[in-house]
């Protein structure tokens, strides 16, 4: 995949810096108001009953704050959090080792939970439902099942693909929340807050310009802020103004709608080679040299959100807005 400044995926080099910008409690968390308000009630109720919070599923496009919310849940409950991911848990024994090391009330966060294999999922079912672990001892006819009690815990699962979760796993989550793209005012506030943490002077217009080009995603907004900060230090006396933000983002090839060179390549390929569609996902991916999953998970959600693309039974189709963005006329 091409390197892109607006990617919604986290890389290891950025992780530590990103952590410093993340809110730690619900009252610091910007946006996702309905999710935040409901979680606050559920957490307070669990604390009043002195019980573990019901299991929580968070889903939505990458970069919207699922990992951050899992940490906030643990902080609000005043418990420890253990973090892992679906691909990292390869065998039932891996999950058993994690579960048996949890303390009462702890939060277990599993990112990309849709990528758990079925044998691991089956170990998770009794753990979620009964706080128990079923272990098979021996082999063949003499094999027997032994049940170990686990301390009550809260599983927080995160996924960009809720539809790929098996029904038995999905049904065991008591709290299910979808995270939505952020508005420009919300992102402007997030950018201003991050600038304050980074000790960067930013004007309101500069924060709004970055927010407008951040694809509705806080992770992208924070990444763009850091790069615009570099331009401001060298060319703007350390102050991020509207003009500095515009110049920096244009140099980074992020346009006024938040689209980068890969989005442009994708949209222009559909316009020029397929007359605006319909065209299949795999064909688009092959045409622009990207993986189908990247196109589907990273590019398409935002293009559909801003009304540039539609998914139809016959394939992807561009809208008149996409043509207007490039100054093209749509063929009738």
Swiss-Prot record:
Instruction: Quote the record's binding site residues for DNA.
Output: 311, 316
**Entry's EC annotation:** 3.6.4.-
Protein's GO biological process:
DNA recombination; DNA repair
Keywords assigned by UniProt?
A: ATP-binding, Cytoplasm, DNA damage, DNA recombination, DNA repair, DNA-binding, Hydrolase, Nucleotide-binding
A single GO molecular function, which one? ATP binding
**Where is the protein localized?**
Cytoplasm
CDD domains hit by this protein: AAA
Highest taxon of source: Bacteria
Q: Which transformation does this protein catalyse, written as a reaction?
A: ATP + H2O = ADP + phosphate + H(+)
Entries under InterPro entries matching the protein: AAA+_ATPase, AAA_lid_4, DNA_helicase_Holl-junc_RuvB, P-loop_NTPase, RuvB-like_N, RuvB_C, WH-like_DNA-bd_sf, WH_DNA-bd_sf
Q: Which GO terms describe its cellular component?
A: cytoplasm; Holliday junction resolvase complex
According to the record, the residues making up region (Head domain (RuvB-H)) are 256-332
State a single Pfam family of this protein: RuvB_C
- Specify where the region named Large ATPase domain (RuvB-L) lies, as residue ranges: 1-182
Task: Please tell me where Mg(2+) binds in this chain.
Answer: 67
Q: Which SUPFAM superfamilies match?
A: P-loop containing nucleoside triphosphate hydrolases, Winged helix' DNA-binding domain
The residues the record assigns to binding ATP are 21-22, 63, 66-68, 129-131, 172, 182, 219
Q: Per its database record, what is this protein's job?
A: The RuvA-RuvB-RuvC complex processes Holliday junction (HJ) DNA during genetic recombination and DNA repair, while the RuvA-RuvB complex plays an important role in the rescue of blocked DNA replication forks via replication fork reversal (RFR). RuvA specifically binds to HJ cruciform DNA, conferring on it an open structure. The RuvB hexamer acts as an ATP-dependent pump, pulling dsDNA into and through the RuvAB complex. RuvB forms 2 homohexamers on either side of HJ DNA bound by 1 or 2 RuvA tetramers; 4 subunits per hexamer contact DNA at a time.
Its UniProt domain note says:
Has 3 domains, the large (RuvB-L) and small ATPase (RuvB-S) domains and the C-terminal head (RuvB-H) domain. The head domain binds DNA, while the ATPase domains jointly bind ATP, ADP or are empty depending on the state of the subunit in the translocation cycle. During a single DNA translocation step the structure of each domain remains the same, but their relative positions change.
How does this protein assemble? Homohexamer. Forms an RuvA(8)-RuvB(12)-Holliday junction (HJ) complex. HJ DNA is sandwiched between 2 RuvA tetramers; dsDNA enters through RuvA and exits via RuvB. An RuvB hexamer assembles on each DNA strand where it exits the tetramer. Each RuvB hexamer is contacted by two RuvA subunits (via domain III) on 2 adjacent RuvB subunits; this complex drives branch migration. In the full resolvosome a probable DNA-RuvA(4)-RuvB(12)-RuvC(2) complex forms which resolves the HJ.
The molecule here is called Holliday junction branch migration complex subunit RuvB
Species name for this entry?
Answer: Brevibacillus brevis (strain 47 / JCM 6285 / NBRC 100599)
What broad taxonomic lineage does this protein's source fall under? Bacteria, Bacillati, Bacillota, Bacilli, Bacillales
Q: By which gene is this protein encoded? A: ruvB
């Amino acid at each position: 995949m091409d390197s892109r400044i607006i990617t919604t995926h986290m890389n290891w080099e950025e992780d530590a810096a990103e952590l410093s910008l993340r809110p730690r409690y619900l009252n610091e968390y910007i946006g996702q108001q309905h999710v935040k308000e409901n979680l606050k009630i559920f957490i307070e109720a669990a604390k009043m009953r002195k019980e573990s919070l019901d299991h929580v599923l968070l889903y939505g496009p990458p970069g919207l704050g699922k990992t951050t919310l899992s940490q906030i849940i643990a902080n609000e409950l005043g418990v420890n959090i253990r973090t892992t991911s679906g691909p990292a848990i390869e065998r039932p024994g891996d999950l058993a080792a994690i579960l048996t090391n949890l303390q009462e009330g702890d939060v277990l966060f599993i990112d990309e939970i849709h990528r758990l294999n079925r044998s691991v999922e089956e170990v998770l079912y009794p753990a979620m439902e009964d706080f128990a672990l079923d272990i098979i001892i021996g082999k063949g006819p003499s094999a027997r099942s032994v049940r170990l009690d686990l301390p009550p815990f809260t599983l927080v699962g995160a996924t960009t693909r809720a539809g790929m979760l098996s029904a038995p796993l999905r049904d065991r989550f008591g709290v299910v929340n979808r995270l939505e793209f952020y508005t420009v005012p919300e992102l402007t506030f997030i950018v201003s807050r991050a600038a304050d943490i980074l000790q960067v002077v930013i004007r309101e217009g500069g924060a709004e310009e970055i927010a407008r080009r951040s694809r509705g995603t806080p992770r992208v907004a924070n990444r763009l802020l850091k790069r615009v900060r570099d331009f401001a230090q060298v060319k703007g006396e350390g102050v991020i103004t509207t003009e500095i933000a515009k110049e920096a983002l244009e140099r980074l090839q992020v346009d006024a709608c938040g689209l980068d060179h890969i989005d442009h390549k994708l949209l222009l390929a559909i316009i020029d080679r397929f007359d605006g569609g319909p065209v299949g996902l795999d064909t688009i991916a092959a045409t622009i040299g990207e993986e189908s999953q990247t196109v589907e998970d990273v590019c398409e959600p935002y293009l559909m959100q801003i009304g540039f693309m539609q998914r139809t039974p016959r394939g992807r189709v561009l809208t008149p807005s996409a043509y207007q963005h490039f100054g093209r006329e749509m063929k009738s």
